[in-house]
Amino acid sequence: MAVKLGTLLLALALGLAQPASARRKLLVFLLDGFRSDYISDEALESLPGFKEIVSRGVKVDYLTPDFPSLSYPNYYTLMTGRHCEVHQMIGNYMWDPTTNKSFDIGVNKDSLMPLWWNGSEPLWVTLTKAKRKVYMYYWPGCEVEILGVRPTYCLEYKNVPTDINFANAVSDALDSFKSGRADLAAIYHERIDVEGHHYGPASPQRKDALKAVDTVLKYMTKWIQERGLQDRLNVIIFSDHGMTDIFWMDKVIELNKYISLNDLQQVKDRGPVVSLWPAPGKHSEIYNKLSTVEHMTVYEKEAIPSRFYYKKGKFVSPLTLVADEGWFITENREMLPFWMNSTGRREGWQRGWHGYDNELMDMRGIFLAFGPDFKSNFRAAPIRSVDVYNVMCNVVGITPLPNNGSWSRVMCMLKGRASTAPPVWPSHCALALILLFLLA
């Protein structure tokens, strides 16, 4: 009897260790700045590519980003399943007082330092360590050696990828799957975000950018069939955050009107969230003066709301400013981040921005998925950016590292056995093996 029970427990352990999708491939899209209502039911009627994907797969009501609702923090949250204060990528702009090094939205050389990236292990590193082949296209960070590891292939982001770049990346990724060169491919596309910033989330330019993506995705579903990948490939599409309207003409908070900028040791970022390091002896004075400013809140580090999962980050500044939705914080108007428009000079006004309180409706992103492991024509309740990691781990058949995601929020979207697999199964296997040992 003990032998039979032991055999059963061993089979249970091995079964839990092998998700149904263990050898299926995964194609991931990160579409920057894609607000949830861009693919409302009404909008889908003019987006045949997205409409087909929704009918064939899963669409969540919306995805709530991590705070701050900025790009780099959520790039890492999505790929680690951890809050910003855990993975340490707490902003697009960061400063480390100990080393006097800065992270400036990934464009400066010091942004490539392990200092910023080694706080957590992203999925592509875990897969690469497991001898799985990972192809990444324009994905911020794929060019960085993280925890001593680089992906199999990285087409480095240097300029905003064009629509043709995007289409070529999709085609190349599918060819890589067919040839066996890739197990995971991850594609980043930024144009929807760029047009949303420059012209606003409701602008014709942003809508044109979305239609261009829709066209490529429509072709993609056809290309998957042509390459015979429909039973071997899962596709997941998500965004890092949404976008809201801003009004530089009347909703700008200029810090130099309230404090002396000479009393600051360092300032990082402009917009919804600004980090301040007061000069020695100036903390209380600056805090008291900024506490009276309307349309923003100034937080000392320990007073930052716990719901942001932000204040424990090691790069969080002594003072953090958070603007009300639609308001923009800067040192002065001359320091506003104008963009280079058709004049060839940096004088274009920004019309859209993100980074605000992550619970605001306009900050919501998207999550779509289809393939052999996902239910079809299925609408799911809202999820959070920390939840996406467990879904990806499940469908590629790899053990997720400890994370902040909720399995109960995402298991409903998966078919059959995949939906019942726990997000972290080693503890179950360990229990089975311990019982087996005791019965031996």
UniProtKB/Swiss-Prot annotation:
<feature type="glycosylation site" description="N-linked (GlcNAc...) asparagine">
    <location>
        <position position="118"/>
    </location>
</feature>
<feature type="binding site">
    <location>
        <position position="71"/>
    </location>
    <ligand>
        <name>Zn(2+) 1</name>
    </ligand>
</feature>
<feature type="binding site">
    <location>
        <position position="241"/>
    </location>
    <ligand>
        <name>substrate</name>
    </ligand>
</feature>
<comment type="similarity">
    <text>Belongs to the nucleotide pyrophosphatase/phosphodiesterase family.</text>
</comment>
<keyword id="KW-0862">Zinc</keyword>
<dbReference type="GO" id="GO:0008889">
    <property type="term" value="F:glycerophosphodiester phosphodiesterase activity"/>
</dbReference>
<dbReference type="Pfam" id="PF01663">
    <property type="entry name" value="Phosphodiest"/>
</dbReference>
<feature type="binding site">
    <location>
        <position position="193"/>
    </location>
    <ligand>
        <name>Zn(2+) 2</name>
    </ligand>
</feature>
<dbReference type="GO" id="GO:0070062">
    <property type="term" value="C:extracellular exosome"/>
</dbReference>
<dbReference type="GO" id="GO:0046872">
    <property type="term" value="F:metal ion binding"/>
</dbReference>
<keyword id="KW-0449">Lipoprotein</keyword>
<keyword id="KW-0597">Phosphoprotein</keyword>
<feature type="lipid moiety-binding region" description="GPI-anchor amidated serine">
    <location>
        <position position="419"/>
    </location>
</feature>
<dbReference type="GO" id="GO:0019695">
    <property type="term" value="P:choline metabolic process"/>
</dbReference>
<feature type="signal peptide">
    <location>
        <begin position="1"/>
        <end position="22"/>
    </location>
</feature>
<keyword id="KW-1003">Cell membrane</keyword>
<feature type="glycosylation site" description="N-linked (GlcNAc...) asparagine">
    <location>
        <position position="404"/>
    </location>
</feature>
<feature type="binding site">
    <location>
        <position position="354"/>
    </location>
    <ligand>
        <name>Zn(2+) 2</name>
    </ligand>
</feature>
<feature type="propeptide" description="Removed in mature form">
    <location>
        <begin position="420"/>
        <end position="440"/>
    </location>
</feature>
<feature type="active site" description="Nucleophile">
    <location>
        <position position="71"/>
    </location>
</feature>
<feature type="binding site">
    <location>
        <position position="197"/>
    </location>
    <ligand>
        <name>Zn(2+) 2</name>
    </ligand>
</feature>
<feature type="binding site">
    <location>
        <position position="354"/>
    </location>
    <ligand>
        <name>substrate</name>
    </ligand>
</feature>
<feature type="binding site">
    <location>
        <position position="241"/>
    </location>
    <ligand>
        <name>Zn(2+) 1</name>
    </ligand>
</feature>
<dbReference type="GO" id="GO:0005576">
    <property type="term" value="C:extracellular region"/>
</dbReference>
<keyword id="KW-0325">Glycoprotein</keyword>
<keyword id="KW-0479">Metal-binding</keyword>
<dbReference type="GO" id="GO:0098552">
    <property type="term" value="C:side of membrane"/>
</dbReference>
<dbReference type="InterPro" id="IPR002591">
    <property type="entry name" value="Phosphodiest/P_Trfase"/>
</dbReference>
<dbReference type="GO" id="GO:0008081">
    <property type="term" value="F:phosphoric diester hydrolase activity"/>
</dbReference>
<feature type="binding site">
    <location>
        <position position="193"/>
    </location>
    <ligand>
        <name>substrate</name>
    </ligand>
</feature>
<feature type="modified residue" description="Phosphoserine">
    <location>
        <position position="71"/>
    </location>
</feature>
<feature type="binding site">
    <location>
        <position position="32"/>
    </location>
    <ligand>
        <name>Zn(2+) 1</name>
    </ligand>
</feature>
<comment type="function">
    <text>Choline-specific glycerophosphodiesterase that hydrolyzes glycerophosphocholine (GPC) and lysophosphatidylcholine (LPC) and contributes to supplying choline to the cells. Has a preference for LPC with short (12:0 and 14:0) or polyunsaturated (18:2 and 20:4) fatty acids. In vitro, hydrolyzes only choline-containing lysophospholipids, such as sphingosylphosphorylcholine (SPC), platelet-activating factor (PAF) and lysoPAF, but not other lysophospholipids.</text>
</comment>
<feature type="binding site">
    <location>
        <position position="240"/>
    </location>
    <ligand>
        <name>Zn(2+) 1</name>
    </ligand>
</feature>
<dbReference type="GO" id="GO:0046475">
    <property type="term" value="P:glycerophospholipid catabolic process"/>
</dbReference>
<feature type="glycosylation site" description="N-linked (GlcNAc...) asparagine">
    <location>
        <position position="341"/>
    </location>
</feature>
<dbReference type="InterPro" id="IPR017850">
    <property type="entry name" value="Alkaline_phosphatase_core_sf"/>
</dbReference>
<keyword id="KW-0732">Signal</keyword>
<protein>
    <recommendedName>
        <fullName>Glycerophosphocholine cholinephosphodiesterase ENPP6</fullName>
        <ecNumber>3.1.4.-</ecNumber>
        <ecNumber>3.1.4.38</ecNumber>
    </recommendedName>
</protein>
<dbReference type="GO" id="GO:0047390">
    <property type="term" value="F:glycerophosphocholine cholinephosphodiesterase activity"/>
</dbReference>
<comment type="subunit">
    <text>Homodimer; disulfide-linked. Homotetramer.</text>
</comment>
<keyword id="KW-0378">Hydrolase</keyword>
